[in-house]
C-alpha cells in the first residue's frame, strides 16, 4: 500500500533534507497536484514544524508566501504539506556561474523587499535572510519570488497594540553569519532593520559573486563568527559597494541609520532601485539571467549541469564564491511589456524585437502554462510589478522555473546559527533547511 499523509497526500521520492528532517515530493490524490511534504521526527530534540506551521497560518494569502495545505502528525512524524516550488536563488546563482547581472538583481530586489514588508506587517521578523530561503515559483508563478523557512522567525511586536519588543544586548547570534547585520554580530536584539540589512548583503553577493568575509579560516564556529564580524565591521559601505551603482551604498547607509524600533521605509528602498532600473534602460520583462543562460546553452548545444528539482526549498551549500566579471551577451526579450515606456536597445542602438518562436524553440523547455500580469515599474506602491495572473495575452508563455535543473552543491563554509537557551527566546532551538 502506498504511503499517505493526511489521508490525502501520496508520499513520493525524497527531494531534500535539512536539520529538521526531510522533504519529499508528494501528490494530492484528489487533484493529482504535486506538493512538497516536510517530515520531522516527533522524537527530535527541538521540534520546529509545529511552530513553523503556526507562522504559515498567520502569513497565508500573502504574495510570495507558500500555501500550507496540511499540518499534522502521522505515526512517528510531524508533517507539513506545502506548495511545491522551484529552485532557490542560491541554486540559480550557481547555475549562472555565481554572478547575476544588475538587471536580474534589481528585478529580484523589488520582490524581496515586498516579501519582508509583508512579513513585518504581520508582526514577525524572519531572522534568516539568505539566498537559500528565496525560491522561484512554478508554472504561471515562475517569475514570482517566494520566501520560506520560518524556523528562526520571531514576533517583534504585539499584534493588537503594536507594542515593540524591548531593546536588549548580549544576544546569541541567530541566523546565517554571512548575511547577518552588524548589530546582530554585536549581540543586539534583532528588529526589522536587521532583516533589511541582511537583504542588502544578498544583493551585493549576487552582484559581486562573493562577500569579503567569505572563506575565512578559523578553528571553530565561534572563532569563525568572530572573524566574519571583524571583517564586516572593518569593511566600509563604500568599499563593499565599490564598482556598483551608488544606490546600493545608499541602501546600506539607510539601513544603518534606522533605530531599533523604526519601521523601515520600504517604498523609499524600492524607489531607489526602481529609479536605477529606469535610468539603466532596463525592461521589466522577467527575463532573468537563468533564462538567458539556458537559452545560450540550448543554442550552443553544450548544456551545463543544472540545478535541483523544484521543491519547497532544500538548503544548498554556501561555498566561497568566485565572481564572473564578464557581462552576458544580450538575449532577445521574452515579451514586450505594453505598460513599460522604455525600450531596450540592441548593440546598434535600435529597439530589439524578435518573434516569440525564435526565442522559445521547441527544444527549449522554458514554459508550460499561461499567464502573467504586469505593472509599470515606476509604480512605488507595495503591489508587485507583476501579479502572476492568467489574463495577460501579451505573456502567453510563463516561465516554469527551469525544468529538471540540478546543481550539486558542496557543504558550505557557514551555516545558520541557532538560538541558545537564554530564557528569553520562545521560538524553537533548531534550524531547518
Curated annotation (Swiss-Prot):
Active site residues per record: 128
Keywords: ATP-binding, Cytoplasm, Kinase, Nucleotide-binding, Phosphoprotein, Serine/threonine-protein kinase, Transferase
Post-translational modification: Autophosphorylated.
InterPro entries: CK1_Ser-Thr_kinase, Kinase-like_dom_sf, Prot_kinase_dom, Protein_kinase_ATP_BS, Ser/Thr_kinase_AS
Residue segments, region Disordered: 297-433
GO CC aspect terms: cytoplasm
Chain positions found as Phosphoserine: 390
Location of this chain's protein in the cell: Cytoplasm
Enzyme class: transferase
GO MF annotation: an example: ATP binding
Record field: compositional bias (Low complexity): 362-375
EC number annotated for this UniProt entry: 2.7.11.1
Reactions catalysed, as given in the entry: L-seryl-[protein] + ATP = O-phospho-L-seryl-[protein] + ADP + H(+); L-threonyl-[protein] + ATP = O-phospho-L-threonyl-[protein] + ADP + H(+)
Residue stretches of biased makeup (Basic and acidic residues): 342-359
Binding site for ATP: 15-23, 38
Residues covered by the Protein kinase domain: 9-278
Subunit structure: Monomer.
Entry's family note: Belongs to the protein kinase superfamily. CK1 Ser/Thr protein kinase family. Casein kinase I subfamily.
Name of the protein this chain belongs to: Casein kinase 1-like protein 5
Organism: Arabidopsis thaliana
Lineage: Eukaryota, Viridiplantae, Streptophyta, Embryophyta, Tracheophyta
Gene behind the chain: CKL5
